[in-house]
Amino acid sequence: MATLNEVYPVNYNVLSSDAFQQLDTTGFKSKYDEMIKAFEKKWKKGAKGKDLLDVAWTYITTGEIDPLNVIKGVLSVLTLIPEVGTVASAASTIVSFIWPKIFGDKPNAKNIFEELKPQIEALIQQDITNYQDAINQKKFDSLQKTINLYTVAIDNNDYVTAKTQLENLNSILTSDISIFIPEGYETGGLPYYAMVANAHILLLRDAIVNAEKLGFSDKEVDTHKKYIKMTIHNHTEAVIKAFLNGLDKFKSLDVNSYNKKANYIKGMTEMVLDLVALWPTFDPDHYQKEVEIEFTRTISSPIYQPVPKNMQNTSSSIVPSDLFHYQGDLVKLEFSTRTDNDGLAKIFTGIRNTFYKSPNTHETYHVDFSYNTQSSGNISRGSSNPIPIDLNNPIISTCIRNSFYKAIAGSSVLVNFKDGTQGYAFAQAPTGGAWDHSFIESDGAPEGHKLNYIYTSPGDTLRDFINVYTLISTPTINELSTEKIKGFPAEKGYIKNQGIMKYYGKPEYINGAQPVNLENQQTLIFEFHASKTAQYTIRIRYASTQGTKGYFRLDNQELQTLNIPTSHNGYVTGNIGENYDLYTIGSYTITEGNHTLQIQHNDKNGMVLDRIEFVPKDSLQDSPQDSPPEVHESTIIFDKSSPTIWSSNKHSYSHIHLEGSYTSQGSYPHNLLINLFHPTDPNRNHTIHVNNGDMNVDYGKDSVADGLNFNKITATIPSDAWYSGTITSMHLFNDNNFKTITPKFELSNELENITTQVNALFASSAQDTLASNVSDYWIEQVVMKVDALSDEVFGKEKKALRKLVNQAKRLSKIRNLLIGGNFDNLVAWYMGKDVVKESDHELFKSDHVLLPPPTFHPSYIFQKVEESKLKPNTRYTISGFIAHGEDVELVVSRYGQEIQKVMQVPYEEALPLTSESNSSCCVPNLNINETLADPHFFSYSIDVGSLEMEANPGIEFGLRIVKPTGMARVSNLEIREDRPLTAKEIRQVQRAARDWKQNYEQERTEITAIIQPVLNQINALYENEDWNGSIRSNVSYHDLEQIMLPTLLKTEEINCNYDHPAFLLKVYHWFMTDRIGEHGTILARFQEALDRAYTQLESRNLLHNGHFTTDTANWTIEGDAHHTILEDGRRVLRLPDWSSNATQTIEIEDFDLDQEYQLLIHAKGKGSITLQHGEENEYVETHTHHTNDFITSQNIPFTFKGNQIEVHITSEDGEFLIDHITVIEVSKTDTNTNIIENSPINTSMNSNVRVDIPRSL
């Protein structure tokens, strides 16, 4: 028997027992990423196509990812160059997905044509069953045979044969690929053609990438490089021509034609155009490493109208004439409302979509459709409750309902988020009132998509809606990668105070995004984020028929002139009629953090900007001194009172060039020209003696291998004499061939300084207790100083000091209540899905964690200190070190989040390690907004009063990123005992504890009232109330359907009921929004118990699919009988009249003539069920069901005369709706009689949420 204490433990804020594994990883994006990582791991090792097919098969067969998205995933990793020594064929890999059977694998595997056939037929409204017959079979067989020969040769490392077959295959594909778009199937064959074109382009990539192994000469490689460009061009033109020909069929602007057109564009985008957009990236001449191109293209739903048929619009006035563009990320939906003078009808009058598109400044903007506009009559305006949207929890489906009383009234909108939660808005008339009927329209995003915005026509009240979708995989933040080439659509940027962003007059279908038509004098602003310091080449993909000019600026660096040539047709000609090309702007060192670049068009000649690409070089994590060049052309004044010419705690440089003049001791001005290369001494100082006269100093001609960098230029004079100067030009450079010098301490005073610091770590000479003011971070700083002592000069002393600092580190670990504060041990940490452990950072001796921007998943670390580790009436210190943090929130909670602070810690580099008693990190610096930044080291305190061992509040510690562009690198985290509380402090903490305890007990009372009745209902399902045992013999589907859980962990379908209870269980943890919390654990256990009961019910039922969870599978249908979903969400078999029926034949194993059986049916209307049995079906049992509502009826137990029974359901008079039907064995102890349950049930509409009965087992 499950008890309340068992399912609802007393412990405060507990996580579920499996919380480490219970991340929200069930969504498409998580599964897709998981699959990509598996692909990348195998591909890097030189895996064959069949190996990747095995990986994909798991996701395909479970239905987690559809075959088309699997192929897109494969294509995304084929640009990755495998490890040295392996030859992996990208062409044969993709072919193994198109035609898996030609390799003899997976005998039940469908080829991609079979998978896409239903979708293609729906798009083009043409039966393509005979498509394969229309393909030239002789040429097709020749193609497959050559593919097989090439693949076998590659697999066997027979490169001579592989080269021959590659050339043969290229020849066949060049001449015969048109067989896949035969006459009559020019559009229908397009998805197949695109798949084979993938293989052709990748085949040429194989020839270039594997040229040395395959034996191609340099001349042959040059030919292949030209040919791959021509092939991409030709295949792209063939696809776009056929696509546009198909699009021409939808020229009418009425609603019906628009819906067909929208569906055609949607399907072709997913099946064809997304592939075409990748083809240019297959050219290794420009894409030498793995490539990730983001898509911002949109697809739209059909126009849907939640109104009666006689009020639906069909005219062209509501059809949008503009192309739907990506707007940014949707963060809020609002609906304006109006009420008539009588106060009887209140409806939505418009939609406001609010978007987030300016990450660094956290700006939002909105797009309105008919928002708060007056269409007719006297209205009072208002606004419904807004629906806020978390950036990493987008909307994936919508449901709009209008309720009617002579006119549109009582509108409501319900949305489903990615994690299964819901949001809603409604327009409720002030007086309430009865409504005739509700009209509901629902729409869901295609797999892998999210809602970008909702469009409504401007002409009338909200009768006409279109959902515009974009890819879930398109992140809010433009995050650079040190491993991949990243391409970002230009439309992810914005134009500020220079008019609106304009697009070309025609849509561009082949880029995965809409290019920006940058007008003369307009500046595109593009913001991005880097998690690591690295060098990148920045380039643009553009189109310009006459060449053009412009300017480029990265952050606050100098303006750079751009002379952009005419784009040639080396790759593709877009639908806009211009050719796309690449233009390299330059190479730059980009430090970790947020950045902005600007591209200004400064010419009357046109320029279309498609995307901005970042090509990474090696990471500069090991040489963080490198930084962007700086140029200062403005005048810099210095004198005795202000001697600093330039300084930076963020950047340092190897080469400095100064021009100007100076005056000292009353002399006349003299010219000053100084050209310095970096010094070699560890303190980075270099002195230039300037005499009374013109100075031209040239120190060093080149960088030296062991040189260090400047980070400060100061003018001084040995005496107290006056001096002043003017710098008219200053240039600061880096030469990128220096290295970091590890200091070596060899002087006796340095040993003395370090020894003093080691001794100061301890509270006494016994050295068994740390000093109270010593942090874990400072211990590691002292360790680094000890390590820098010279072995040759101080070998003995160094060994003794190292023993002491090791002891200090052990004591630090013992006193730290956090487990793994340096992340040497992760067992106690809860981490966001994308948080990673890293090492080798100049500001940390130990490991640290990187909290990246929360692009797709929350970014956090969390740990709880149990109550048993604490002492009563004690103050505890919480401390840690943040190397770099932007929008990182520290939360420490016992009685209610006592510490909650968002910190901004700027990116800074380590200062040279010295023997002095200072850290290698810098002092607090100014942020971009000139406000004082937070220090790298934080320290706070929290007070603990009396211990609550039963409730176990403990101390909860967490760091998380709270803005989309935030990030952090942290380590040396501690919670340690400080001191006993004073009497006054004890009284203060007692008051806080009393308030906390009162709220805690109230919450438990409320939760208990909610879950106890459900607990009792579930206990009643099972024999001996054992949830792991068997359900009772009299349990029916009806019993399960009447059990209402307070909320749902996940929901897969739209449920237009929005009458939520006043109190909702907190499914997720209060801090970690992607992990199941204590209430979620309760619901999960309830759902598991119901799932087990449902499974047992299914196994008892002799009828297959008696609950119609898989439509009408296993049933033979006649007439108009069909599966349908009712307005309340109920799935039923509908027999509309007496001419429709459904039949199923069942066969009983281990048949017993004496075994009794019973029929139970839950239905509405008048119908009959007959069961025919015997050798010739001569025996008939009949049961009649006649009710005006959904009610369960059952017959008297009976026996069968044979093991085969035919069950026949028919309507007797009008509509007959069957919710479920069962035929079960009757226990020999059962004494049930024929009864009708007269309590109608509602299986979907409820005050809480319906039990999530599985729809597929």
Curated annotation (Swiss-Prot):
GO BP annotations, alphabetical order: sporulation resulting in formation of a cellular spore; symbiont-mediated killing of host cell
InterPro entries in the cross-refs: Cry_V (IPR041587), Galactose-bd-like_sf (IPR008979), Pest_crys (IPR038979), Pest_crys_dom-III (IPR005638), Pest_crys_dom_I (IPR005639), Pest_crys_N_sf (IPR036716)
One GO molecular-function entry: toxin activity
Keywords tagged on the record: Sporulation, Toxin, Virulence
Pfam name, any one: Endotoxin_C
Family membership noted in the UniProt record: Belongs to the delta endotoxin family.
Other information: Toxic segment of the protein is located in the N-terminus.
Role of this protein: Endotoxin with nematicidal activity.
Name this protein carries in UniProt: Pesticidal crystal protein Cry12Aa
Organism annotation: Bacillus thuringiensis
